[in-house]
Amino acid sequence: MSLSSLAISANNISYRIGSKIILDDINLELRCGEVTTLLGPNGAGKSTLLKLLCDEITSFNDIRYFGKAKDQWDGNELAKRLGVLPQHSTLSFAFNVNEVVELGGLPLSLSNQALREITSNMMQKTVIKHLAERAYPSLSGGEKQRVHLARVLTQVSQHQQKIVMLDEPTSALDLSHQHNTLKLARELASEGAAVIVVLHDLNLAAQYSDRVIVLQDGKLQADGAPWEAITSKMIENVYGHKTLVQAHPTLNFPVVFAA
């Protein structure tokens, strides 16, 4: 693997709160051009791992972005390459949707016209252009989620080599927007980004991921392509539920059925 294709390297990642071990000696290398999905039951450590990887939680773990430690990066430059959609985004000001999306341009050196063009494009991709003048607090949960996705996409729009982290980006979305969001993740990866997604839906993970990482009680339980990681045995061991995993009738990914 060339260094340029390695977006994140994280060695011996551990985290605890008091005596509770949240993550236990996780080693990861995340590559450009791939969608990597984190799976696992509630409390497995998925969101904590994402927060450590993006430095939302300060730690002394060895995490590198594109081969450089965080303290070797200029903060503004890293912000242009590392976009994070948290599980919950709050905003109390009555900005309209267009203004919220434009907040993603803060680390960028762009003319007003260039920023308007980028935000318009990202709003089109996330299907929120019709909401442009709506006050953000008046939106539904799913609409707010798509607004923040457009903001994150605006933030990282100027670099082909970038990292996009999405923590449960489909949790408030209807079926159509779930698939649109994960198609955008695939599009980003095809353009060279490293995309890391936290999901609960195993079938969405199987359909849209290049790689699936399964956590349980802070430990790595599976790591591989969807066919390698999403198996009936893994699901029973990790989730305690019997399932049947079969091939999609026309597409090459596993489909999980309740047994």
Curated annotation (Swiss-Prot):
Its main location: membrane. The complex is composed of two ATP-binding proteins (HmuV), two transmembrane proteins (HmuU) and a solute-binding protein (HmuT). SUPFAM superfamilies: P-loop containing nucleoside triphosphate hydrolases. Its EC number is 7.6.2.-. It is found in: Cell inner membrane. Gene3D superfamilies: P-loop containing nucleotide triphosphate hydrolases. This is Hemin import ATP-binding protein HmuV. Residues 8-242 form the ABC transporter domain. It comes from Aliivibrio fischeri (strain ATCC 700601 / ES114). PROSITE patterns: ABC_TRANSPORTER_2, HMUV. It holds the Pfam family ABC_tran. The keyword Ribonucleoprotein does not apply. The keyword Membrane applies. GO terms for molecular function: ATP binding; ATP hydrolysis activity. It comes from the Bacteria. Keywords: ATP-binding, Cell inner membrane, Cell membrane, Membrane, Nucleotide-binding, Translocase, Transport. Part of the ABC transporter complex HmuTUV involved in hemin import. Responsible for energy coupling to the transport system. It is a peripheral membrane protein. Belongs to the ABC transporter superfamily. Heme (hemin) importer (TC 3.A.1.14.5) family. InterPro entries: AAA+_ATPase, ABC_transporter-like_ATP-bd, P-loop_NTPase. GO terms for cellular component: plasma membrane. ATP binds at residues 40-47.
